[in-house]
């Protein structure tokens, strides 16, 4: 690896204990110890790009998604094969009479019945063994807990703070002070904590004269109780089943209110190369309901009903900023009931198709 201080190419022996043997200065990460792609220069480079060279601040969660070296997701697989009990329950009643017939017969009949009995037993013994079903899952390398540990322990102990422009959004992090908004003109309803911290720390709601409301999708209706009904609502959510249903259900509950869906659309990530795909452990949502309520295509509804989802926090920060800005401006000029299911998706990029029938796998920024 390359020393982040003197740029010397270091062998394993020249970087023992995360200290450069040439300049004798410590560094935080070593790919050999902390995993592929985990080195100071790469983390700094990705953080600089994410913050637009210092113009924006980003969260540790956003940096984690951007610095991942691998992500993959797989759907559930049904059980297949025959249970041993069933195999022998069928085979023994057939094989036993044949063995008896062979034992008490002579000549050709004994040979044929004996061979048939052996064939039945052999088929039962060699039949495909039952493989239990497997639930879907996903994998991101490094894991979020591991990445946070590296940032909190190794990086802070080496440099005294997180990379420039990166803020902690963990559960123990202090709350971010939000710039005051005198008379808000709109509401931004955000269901992702990392994205809400990103918006607050960059003063985006105040700049747009919007009130930021953070809530889980299931609690979104209650979170809007204290918000004046005249204010338009811009909804930010993951590309998930609950996220896709949120804006349509809010429109039904508040027919006199502008509700603009600016969440991450499934069409932008389902077949997009490089998008992060994850699998939820929550009970599946019926595909028919997703089509009827959210107006999704058959393919998108099936993808979500299989448990797949994609996090809003994985969207590049500059793209996220531009989408939120455009969505609030659009909501301010819209009329109640005039927005359809596709409105709010106009600023999101279309997905780049991937070969059908393959496991969802994406790689993060180059690990070099």
Regions found by a protein language model. Give the residues of each.
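Acidic beta-strand-to-loop metal/phosphate-binding motif
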Residues: 228-242
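Nucleic-acid enzyme cleavage-core boundary/entry regions
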Residues: 1-231, 246-368
């Amino acid at each position: 690896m390359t020393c982040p201080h003197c740029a010397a190419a270091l062998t394993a022996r020249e970087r023992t204990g995360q200290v450069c043997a040439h300049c004798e200065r410590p560094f935080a990460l070593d790919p050999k110890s902390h995993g592929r792609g985990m080195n100071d220069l790469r983390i700094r480079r990705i953080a600089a790009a994410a913050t637009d060279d210092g113009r924006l601040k980003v969260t540790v969660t956003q940096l984690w998604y951007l610095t991942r070296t691998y992500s993959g997701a797989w759907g559930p697989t049904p059980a297949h094969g025959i249970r041993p009990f069933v195999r022998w329950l069928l085979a023994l009643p057939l094989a036993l009479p044949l063995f008896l017939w062979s034992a008490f017969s002579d000549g050709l009949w004994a040979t044929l019945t004996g061979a048939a009995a052996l064939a039945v037993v052999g088929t039962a013994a060699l039949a495909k063994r039952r493989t239990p079903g497997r639930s879907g899952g996903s994998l991101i390398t490094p894991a979020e807990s591991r990445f946070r540990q590296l940032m909190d322990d190794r990086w802070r102990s080496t440099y005294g703070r997180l990379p420039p422009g990166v803020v902690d959004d963990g559960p123990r992090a202090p709350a971010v002070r939000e710039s005051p908004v005198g008379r808000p003109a709109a509401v931004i309803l955000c269901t992702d904590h990392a994205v809400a911290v990103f918006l607050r720390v960059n003063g985006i709601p105040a700049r747009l004269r919007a009130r930021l409301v953070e809530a889980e999708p299931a609690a979104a209706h209650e979170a809007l109780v204290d918000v004046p009904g005249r204010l338009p609502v811009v909804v930010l959510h993951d590309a998930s089943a609950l996220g896709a249903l949120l804006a349509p259900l809010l429109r039904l509950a508040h027919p006199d209110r502008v509700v603009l869906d600016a969440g991450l659309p499934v069409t932008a990530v389902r077949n997009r190369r490089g998008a992060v795909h994850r699998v939820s452990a929550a009970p599946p949502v019926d595909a028919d309901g997703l089509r009827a309520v959210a107006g999704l295509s058959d393919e998108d509804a099936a993808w979500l009903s299989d448990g797949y989802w994609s996090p809003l926090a994985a969207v590049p920060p500059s793209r996220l900023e531009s989408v939120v800005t455009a969505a609030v401006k659009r909501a301010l000029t819209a009329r109640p009931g005039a927005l359809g299911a596709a409105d709010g998706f106009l600023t999101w990029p279309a997905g780049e198709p991937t070969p059908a029938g393959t496991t969802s796998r994406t790689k993060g920024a180059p690990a070099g």
